[in-house]
């Protein structure tokens, strides 16, 4: 194969560290640099090695060479600690594509600061109000080389969009509502605390079911224009640490039995969407999907039809690792046009 794609990561939080794990296990990408102003290299090593959800890193031994370098086995990764993205000298490390995973620089102008340091492309690991959004398996072929800043959308959009695409392509969606029952994330509080923009979101994450807003369903209309204005949704944050589940309730254009819908999803999961969309008829629960790298795993036993035009569909996702794997897939896709 050709030269590896050299990548950098800005923000070594949940997604940043998991993107690093995914990248380090692949032979088509090479992690060359990480920037995080809030953690030292020795603490970075600890946080990467030990993970409460995904377990201990058992691949290459991770050591600190010095305050600016980590060693994964013998492979050096440069570490920066700049608060301002335009100050990060990505070019000095050869990093071509940057994963912007701080959660702070999510619009085009802010993310474009990475280009000043020599990056060629930036992938935002969050929804963006103005950067083009891509969901692998759904619309990544709409990517054009002139797009320097793009978004990998959200974990929930990555779960919902492949499922919605199959249903809309086969049966047509008149309209629909989505609910995601979503694991807690780093923005939530361990005990009741201040959250002026979202009062409910400030309540203790570990023993509440917390209704919340999500733009994930509306964002499907951005990656699948045929569904624009046809879907919206909301979220319940629940006290699990990883894996979430989408409940998509839709009105169909074409009448279909639940068995026909299951067959269509199974066929796509074994065809064009293999590795992205999964299918199971097992009696699964959420922890069964920790570590699953697929974007969306349809639970055939959990869904239900009211009639042949009104149906509830259920699909699981590891909102951390599945999403992080798609970030790397998107890197590989856009690198073909560098």
Swiss-Prot record:
UniProt similarity note: Belongs to the glyceraldehyde-3-phosphate dehydrogenase family.
Subcellular location: Cytoplasm
Protein known as: Glyceraldehyde-3-phosphate dehydrogenase, cytosolic
Positions contributing to D-glyceraldehyde 3-phosphate binding: 154-156, 185, 214-215, 237
Record's keyword annotation contains Lipid biosynthesis: no
Positions contributing to NAD(+) binding: 14-15, 36, 83, 319
Keyword rRNA-binding: no
Coiled coil feature spans: none
GO molecular function, one term: NADP binding
Reaction(s) catalysed by this chain's protein: D-glyceraldehyde 3-phosphate + phosphate + NAD(+) = (2R)-3-phospho-glyceroyl phosphate + NADH + H(+)
Enzyme Commission number(s): 1.2.1.12
Name of encoding gene: GAPC1
Keywords for the protein's UniProt record, in alphabetical order: Cytoplasm, Glycolysis, NAD, Oxidoreductase
BP term (GO), one: glucose metabolic process
Superkingdom: Eukaryota
More details: Plants contain two types of GAPDH: cytosolic forms which participate in glycolysis and chloroplast forms which participate in photosynthesis. All the forms are encoded by distinct genes.
Biochemical pathway: Carbohydrate degradation; glycolysis; pyruvate from D-glyceraldehyde 3-phosphate: step 1/5
UniProt site positions, description: Activates thiol group during catalysis: 182
List of catalytic residues: 155
Organism of origin: Pisum sativum (Garden pea)
Single GO cellular component term: cytosol
InterPro entries: GlycerAld/Erythrose_P_DH, GlycerAld_3-P_DH_AS, GlycerAld_3-P_DH_cat, GlycerAld_3-P_DH_NAD(P)-bd, Glyceraldehyde-3-P_DH_1, NAD(P)-bd_dom_sf
Pfam families hit by this protein: Gp_dh_C, Gp_dh_N
SUPFAM superfamilies linked: Glyceraldehyde-3-phosphate dehydrogenase-like, C-terminal domain, NAD(P)-binding Rossmann-fold domains
């Amino acid at each position: 194969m050709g030269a590896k794609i050299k990548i950098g990561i800005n923000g070594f939080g949940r997604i940043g560290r998991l993107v690093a794990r995914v990248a380090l296990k692949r032979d088509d990408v090479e992690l060359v640099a990480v920037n995080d102003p809030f953690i030292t290299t020795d603490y970075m090593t600890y946080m990467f090695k030990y993970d409460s959800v995904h377990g201990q890193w058992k691949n290459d031994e991770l050591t600190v060479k010095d305050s600016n370098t980590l060693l994964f086995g013998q492979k050096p990764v440069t570490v920066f600690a700049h608060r301002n993205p335009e100050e990060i000298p990505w070019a000095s490390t050869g990093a071509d594509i940057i994963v912007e995973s701080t959660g702070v620089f999510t619009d085009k102008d802010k993310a474009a600061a990475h280009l000043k340091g020599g990056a060629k492309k930036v992938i935002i690991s969050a929804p963006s109000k103005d950067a083009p959004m891509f969901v692998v398996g759904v619309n990544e072929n709409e990517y054009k080389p002139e797009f320097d800043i793009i978004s990998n959308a959200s974990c929930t959009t990555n779960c919902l969009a492949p499922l919605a695409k199959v249903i809309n392509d086969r049966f047509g969606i008149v309209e629909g509502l989505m609910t995601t029952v979503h694991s807690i994330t780093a923005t939530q509080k361990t005990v009741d605390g201040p959250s002026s923009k979202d009062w409910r979101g400030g309540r203790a994450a570990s023993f509440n079911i917390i209704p919340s807003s999500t733009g994930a369903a509306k964002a499907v209309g951005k990656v699948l224009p045929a569904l624009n204005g046809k879907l919206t949704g909301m979220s319940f944050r629940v006290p699990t640490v990883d894996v979430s589940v989408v409940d998509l309730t839709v009105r169909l254009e074409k009448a279909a039995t639940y068995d026909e819908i299951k067959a269509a999803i199974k066929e796509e999961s074994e065809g064009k969407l293999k590795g992205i969309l999964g299918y199971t008829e097992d009696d699964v629960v959420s922890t069964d999907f920790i570590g699953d790298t697929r974007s969306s795993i349809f639970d055939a036993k959990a869904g239900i039809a009211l009639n042949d035009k009104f149906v509830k569909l259920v699909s699981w996702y590891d909102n951390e690792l599945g999403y992080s794997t798609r970030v790397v897939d998107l890197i590989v896709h856009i690198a073909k046009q560098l």
